[in-house]
UniProtKB/Swiss-Prot annotation:
Organism: Pseudomonas savastanoi pv. phaseolicola (strain 1448A / Race 6) (Pseudomonas syringae pv. phaseolicola (strain 1448A / Race 6))
Locations listed in the record: Cell inner membrane
Listed name of the protein: Molybdenum import ATP-binding protein ModC
Domain Mop: 297-362
SUPFAM superfamilies (alphabetical): MOP-like, P-loop containing nucleoside triphosphate hydrolases
InterPro entries, alphabetized: AAA+_ATPase (IPR003593), ABC_transporter-like_ATP-bd (IPR003439), ABC_transporter-like_CS (IPR017871), Mo/tungstate-bd_C_term_dom (IPR008995), ModC_ABC_ATP-bd (IPR011868), Molybdenum_import_ModC (IPR050334), Mop_domain (IPR004606), P-loop_NTPase (IPR027417)
Annotated function: Part of the ABC transporter complex ModABC involved in molybdenum import. Responsible for energy coupling to the transport system.
Enzyme class: translocase
Subunit structure: The complex is composed of two ATP-binding proteins (ModC), two transmembrane proteins (ModB) and a solute-binding protein (ModA).
Lineage, top ranks: Bacteria, Pseudomonadati, Pseudomonadota, Gammaproteobacteria, Pseudomonadales
Family: Belongs to the ABC transporter superfamily. Molybdate importer (TC 3.A.1.8) family.
Amino acid sequence: MASPIEVRLHMTYPDFTVRTDLTLPGSGITALFGPSGSGKTTCLRCIAGLEKAGQGFIRVHDEVWQDTEKGVFLAPHKRAIGYVFQEASLFPHLSVRANLEFGMKRIPRQQRNIQLPQATELLGIDHLLERSPDKLSGGERQRVGIARALLTSPRLMLLDEPLAALDARRKSEILPYLERLHRELDIPMLYVSHAQDEVARLADHLVLLEAGNVLASGPIRETLARLDLPLAMGGDAGVVIEGTVSAYDRNYQLLSVTLPDSTLCMRVAHAEMQIGTLLRVKVQARDVSLNLQPDDQSSILNRLPVTVMEEALADNSAHVLVKLDAGGTPLLARITRYSSDQLNLHRGQSLWAQIKAVAVLA
């Protein structure tokens, strides 16, 4: 198992203070999520060494990058990072190939873990190598920027809202490439975003920031299901589930997806996928209703036995959020307070969740 990433920061500005005490996974994608001004980019810049925390301790893969108490501060160029900004900032007078080669120059050949052909193939930019940056779309420029960061052979990738400047179509073009990097490269990523759909699709671990403070840090499926956090109170409240494709009905074009560590299964309308494939889906709280008995005379495909774990008032007093356990997988249901009283909901109660819609993320 990869060594964890430790980030302890205390920075004071005239009208803003950042305090973090984080131990993050040394693999996978960790999302730093929160509204504008919550401290996401400040944390990333401190990790990169572009800002120096007044008090700080940063350790990545057992290498200390900053320790204020011991006077340690590793210069940015000595930190093995690949930094991706909102804008790719390519050199306009160089071709795509020359831009990529520029990123490799400071890395000795014997230390290059990623070669040019591998990076261009991973990002799907082989056909762009001889073009100049002004001939690229926004999505293509950003893919080149990501490839350039990879070619520095980083031990850690830092992505600061890399899709924020792109429209929905360009975002949808890049997301599969980020997922591929996640699958095929053993490089941890810290991904800054305020877009919940991106985070739900990409992240394994979620750090929720607000006004410079860490509200929560944990696996995404657990953090999204916490009723004490603002995420559960919004209209997009829901959970992320990573199940396994266990069957496919060609006649009705329905995948059967087995929930993690469970025999429970959901059916999802989707094109055929190989049995055993991991599939990430999102179930919105507003798409889950509750019933005391299984309703077999319904158009709703997914009916799961669940247990009530806890309940909280939603963002208005007419609704409640109910946290449910479906064979070890957390679910959320948003129902009226009246319905909660009619069902006499209480902790430990067994009932049935009816899931009206399941969104395939990846």
